Amino acid sequence: MEINAKPIDSVNVEVSAKVKSDEIKASVEKLAKKAAKTMKVDGFRQGHVPVAIVLKRYEKELTSDAEQDILRDVLNEAIKKSGKKSDELIGEPLISKFDRKDDGIDVELTASFKPSVSVEGYEALIPEFSTPRVLKKDIDEKKNELLKMFAPLEKVEGKRALKAGDFAKFDFEGFVDGEAFEGGKAENYLLEIGSGQFIPGFEDGMIGLKTGDSKDIEVTFPAEYGAAHLAGKPAVFKVKINEIQERKIPETLDENTLKAIMPNEEKPSEELLEERIKDQIRQDKIFKLISDELKPKFAEAVVEKFKFDTPKNIVEQEIDMQFRNAWNGFSEDERKKFRDDKDAVAKKRDEYRDDAEKSVRLTFIIDELARVRGVKVSDQEVVQAVYFEAYRSGRDPKAHLEMYRNQGMLPAIKMSMIEEKLFNEMFSKEDKKSSKKEKAE
């Protein structure tokens, strides 16, 4: 076996190899002998199957396995020749050539290794920021929203028009092509106007009606509607308003309401409620500040400052992902062109290369920052996060976890959690230049 290993840069090695046919044959026979010891074949005792029989029946599979073994041998030998360490190898090698010939196989591949990353001086790149202020009006608005959720419904007397936020108790029946359809009728149905529970246009069509009013509301079922026989079809709903209700927010908070809003507090009070609301608003504002401003600004700065060679295979994977994500945005003509023209695909992929390089570099920088700052996420935390996601979407947690595991997504989820934890810690609640106590205004 002839192997050459030529460094492209500090993390990528170009490998070329010539594997002779007798080496391939020897590898196939070795695998056949091993298989013969355990294989069951009718007419032969287990462990006494002739190698020739194994070769005859499973030559294709054995050859494929032998080629995989040879590829591993080529890679291992190339690692030694390049002076790299096997535990520094990252991802699968990019195989650019694997030509089978009468006298053997010609192999060309690129092996990539984890880069050495230094983030010395990163602290100077953390953007200056001030902790977002929580205003008194923010607290009052959120408090009213909470109180509205727990406020009892009261009947609206008289002939007041129905408006968004009201609850309508009404009868309705739906018709498509002049015919009533199953599930399209109800009496004294209670609906919050503006909640979006009904198909688009239905609730808007009810606004302005008064108790006792009737109306035909014309709507169109969404194209993606769950019932295929109704999807995309126009419909008419005959509605009659029986009663209008509204939530009455109490002027003062009684003990029962406070306990309902804060069930885990031993001594709930209006002051404690406002403090909890203030904390939540502050956390929401900090999260938005990090997500919208601080993180992008910091990411751009560190990618620009910390330069290093990136693993070619990881960059290519990132390009593939960006290309796939963009696919739905392409016109049908563009898709057809990409299906038929490999050169067009290659040219389009190159448009994502710079962004892919930056994305990969940022991933390694974040990994090093997490190491330096001691930020870790355990496998158990990942499982809990996946389970929580499953519970929220009404899915089976174990099946949801297994789906991510089978897709190889758990490492990416873990990295995302490490990143979130890192930035939340880095951009703490205190001002970078000051630690002035925040006050509600």
Curated annotation (Swiss-Prot):
It is found in: Cytoplasm. GO terms for cellular component: cytoplasm. HAMAP family: Trigger_factor_Tig (MF_00303). GO terms for molecular function: peptidyl-prolyl cis-trans isomerase activity; protein folding chaperone; ribosome binding. Its EC number is 5.2.1.8. Consists of 3 domains; the N-terminus binds the ribosome, the middle domain has PPIase activity, while the C-terminus has intrinsic chaperone activity on its own. It comes from Campylobacter curvus (strain 525.92). Residues 165-250 form the PPIase FKBP-type domain. Keywords: Cell cycle, Cell division, Chaperone, Cytoplasm, Isomerase, Rotamase. It catalyses: [protein]-peptidylproline (omega=180) = [protein]-peptidylproline (omega=0). PROSITE patterns: FKBP_PPIASE. Transmembrane segments: none annotated. This is Trigger factor. Involved in protein export. Acts as a chaperone by maintaining the newly synthesized protein in an open conformation. Functions as a peptidyl-prolyl cis-trans isomerase. GO terms for biological process: 'de novo' cotranslational protein folding; cell division; chaperone-mediated protein folding; protein transport; protein unfolding. SUPFAM superfamilies: FKBP-like, Triger factor/SurA peptide-binding domain-like, Trigger factor ribosome-binding domain. It comes from the Bacteria. Belongs to the FKBP-type PPIase family. Tig subfamily.
